[in-house]
C-alpha cells in the first residue's frame, strides 16, 4: 500500500480526517507535525512523526526520505507561511524523487480569484493569495498533482454529495469529511494529470 506523507494533519481539520481514513485502512503514514502534543498522539496511533515546521527543509527532507520515493504527498496546510512551507515541501519532494501530490487550498485561489467577493477578499484575501502562490509553485514543478479548492468548510459527517467542479464559477460549502473522502479517491487514482478542482456540495448550508 502506497505510503502517505501528510502535512497539516496535526489539528482537527481536513488533514486530521484524511489521517483517519489512512489509519482505518492501515496505510503507512509519515507526517510532519509542528506541535509536540499532536505529534505524540499521532505517534501513538502508529504514524511515523517528524516534529517540526514545514518551512524547515531539514525536517521536510527527513520526512521525504522516510516516506520513500513512492510516497504520495497530501498537504492541507495553511497559515501565514503557507507559500514558503509549500515551496519547501515541493522542492524537497523533487529532490527525494517523490512524484505525486495533492494540495488543498480554497475557493478564490488562482483563476477563481475574480469570483471572490470584495468582502471575502478583505476578510481573508491575504491567505488566499498565499495559497495561490503555493498552487503556482506546484503547477510549475515536476510533480504530478491535483489541487482541491473546497468551499466553506463545515464539520458535519460525510454525505457523499460533494462535487468536483472545473472551469466554472461556483460558491458554496462542503463538509471537511467529504473533502477527505475526495482526497482519498484522488490518491488512489492511477494518475492525477495536473488537474485543479473546486469542491462544494451544492445544496449544503451551515446549520
PLM feature spans:
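Short beta-strand "acidic-cap" motif of Rossmann-like dinucleotide-binding folds
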Residues: 29-31, 148
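Residues in the short beta-alpha loop(s) of Rossmann-like NAD(P)-binding domains
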Residues: 10, 35, 107
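NAD(P)H-binding glycine-rich loop region in Rossmannoid oxidoreductase-like domains
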Residues: 12, 37-95, 188
